[in-house]
């Protein structure tokens, strides 16, 4: 496995862009207040600007009419509000939207998933990923770099603006954010935590801590550190009932095995209010790899001391992967075993797979658009070759 990324990298906060200006999307509220103090202004000005930035998705200082013109002009000289731009949009038949978003000369993917009672945004934390999970398309890209705060919160800002942020109402349709896009969030704590702070801040997006979820594959020291930094909902990418299987499909397990990982999860739960006492277990269903009835019994025994709910995820294929999707009958049988043990078990409905926006598929189109044709063939779909 590739060397893990150092989570203690120098923070990108308050580093001017090439044009010499500070991108205010890089600053959480405390940092924003410090920025205004350094300008000789009152700290409450930071709250006013943040409200315009996040409640109304404004990137124009001239819109901020409750701020005097002298200060607006001063801000234009030293600061900017620059979110990453959408360079491609794809819409699924089920309403899911996937955006390819430019971050410098690279791209990450962000997915909007509407449901009857909520709208969830799946956000990326890195360009690529270092963890090399064998069933994940993003892992095939390898790791490139961590995203800045502005590139993480900027995905939420851009999506909110696109799907209906309006100054007239001050409402935003995005109700939940999940850090489940490209990358391992715990390997970019320096930037992920301030971005999540903005998501939670009343002058930011104002989301409940129960509606912001971080998903991790198990970087244990960083998980312990996270618990001292912020309280958000936690989901863990477990995907195996024992170390033998997990070593193979989630290589970080060789460094931090399941027992070590789950102990860290329980430590996090002891500190957290956001999780309401239990963690979400993510378990991708791989045909004849981790989906046997015996595996379900092993999983139940493994999790008996960890309060949790379990999401079973039908695997989404991509070219070159040596796996198949578990049949519905195998998934149902697996689920029944877990429910018989008393676990809340949900089979996740696949969303956006027709645009490669489903779990484990992000980065497919960015790497090679022709792979979408191959994926559809793997799923037995009819394709219009001229449209590819």
UniProtKB/Swiss-Prot annotation:
SUPFAM superfamilies: Radical SAM enzymes
Keyword set includes rRNA processing: yes
InterPro entries per record: Aldolase_TIM, Methyltransferase_A, RlmN_N, RNA_MTrfase_RlmN, rRNA_lsu_MTrfase_RlmN/Cfr, rSAM
GO cellular component annotations of the record: cytoplasm
Positions annotated as active site in the UniProt record: 109 (proton acceptor), 359 (s-methylcysteine intermediate)
Residue positions binding [4Fe-4S] cluster: 129, 133, 136
Cofactor binding annotation: Binds 1 [4Fe-4S] cluster. The cluster is coordinated with 3 cysteines and an exchangeable S-adenosyl-L-methionine.
Location relative to the cell: Cytoplasm
Disulfide bond annotation, renumbered to this chain: 122-359
Cytoplasm among keywords: yes
A Gene Ontology molecular function term of the record: metal ion binding
Location (main, coarse): cytoplasm
BP term (GO), one: tRNA methylation
Comment field (misc): Reaction proceeds by a ping-pong mechanism involving intermediate methylation of a conserved cysteine residue.
Similarity comment text for this entry: Belongs to the radical SAM superfamily. RlmN family.
Role played: Specifically methylates position 2 of adenine 2503 in 23S rRNA and position 2 of adenine 37 in tRNAs. m2A2503 modification seems to play a crucial role in the proofreading step occurring at the peptidyl transferase center and thus would serve to optimize ribosomal fidelity.
NCBIfam families, alphabetized: PRK11194.1, rRNA_mod_RlmN
Name the UniProt record assigns to this protein: Dual-specificity RNA methyltransferase RlmN
Organism this protein belongs to: Enterobacter sp. (strain 638)
Top-level taxonomy: Bacteria, Pseudomonadati, Pseudomonadota, Gammaproteobacteria, Enterobacterales
């Amino acid at each position: 496995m590739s060397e893990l990324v150092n989570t203690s990298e120098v923070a990108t906060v308050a580093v001017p862009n090439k044009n010499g200006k500070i991108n205010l999307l890089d600053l959480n509220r405390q940092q924003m207040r410090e920025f205004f103090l350094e300008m000789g202004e009152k700290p409450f000005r930071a709250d006013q600007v943040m409200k315009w930035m996040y409640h109304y998705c404004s990137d124009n200082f001239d819109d901020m009419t409750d701020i005097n013109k002298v200060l607006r002009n001063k801000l234009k000289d030293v600061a900017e509000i620059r979110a990453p731009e959408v360079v491609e949009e794809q819409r699924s038949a089920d309403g899911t939207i996937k955006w390819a978003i430019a971050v410098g000369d690279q791209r990450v993917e962000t997915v909007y998933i509407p449901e009857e009672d909520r709208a969830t945004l799946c956000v990326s934390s890195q360009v690529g990923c270092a963890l090399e999970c064998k069933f994940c398309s993003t892992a095939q890209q390898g790791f490139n770099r961590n995203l800045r705060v502005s590139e993480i919160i900027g995905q939420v800002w851009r999506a909110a603006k696109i799907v209906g942020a309006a100054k007239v109402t001050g409402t935003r349709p995005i109700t939940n954010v999940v850090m489940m896009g490209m990358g391992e969030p715990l390997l970019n704590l320096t930037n992920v935590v301030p971005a999540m702070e903005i998501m939670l801040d009343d002058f930011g997006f104002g989301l409940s801590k129960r509606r912001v979820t971080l998903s991790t594959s198990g970087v244990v020291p960083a998980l312990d550190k996270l618990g001292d930094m912020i309280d958000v909902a936690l989901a863990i990418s477990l995907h195996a009932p024992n170390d033998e299987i997990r070593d193979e499909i989630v290589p970080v397990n060789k460094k931090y095995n399941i027992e070590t990982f789950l102990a860290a999860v329980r430590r996090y739960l002891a500190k957290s209010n956001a999780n309401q006492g239990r963690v979400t277990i993510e378990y991708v269903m791989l045909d004849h790899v981790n989906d046997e009835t015996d595996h379900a019994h092993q999983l139940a025994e493994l999790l008996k001391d960890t309060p949790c709910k379990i999401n079973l995820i039908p695997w989404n294929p991509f070219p070159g992967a040596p796996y198949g999707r578990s049949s519905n009958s195998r998934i149902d049988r697996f689920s029944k075993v877990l429910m018989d043990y008393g676990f809340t078990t949900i089979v996740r409905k696949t969303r956006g797979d027709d645009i490669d926006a489903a779990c484990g598929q992000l980065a497919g189109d960015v790497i090679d658009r022709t792979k979408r044709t191959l994926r559809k063939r793997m799923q037995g779909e009819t394709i219009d070759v001229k449209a590819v």
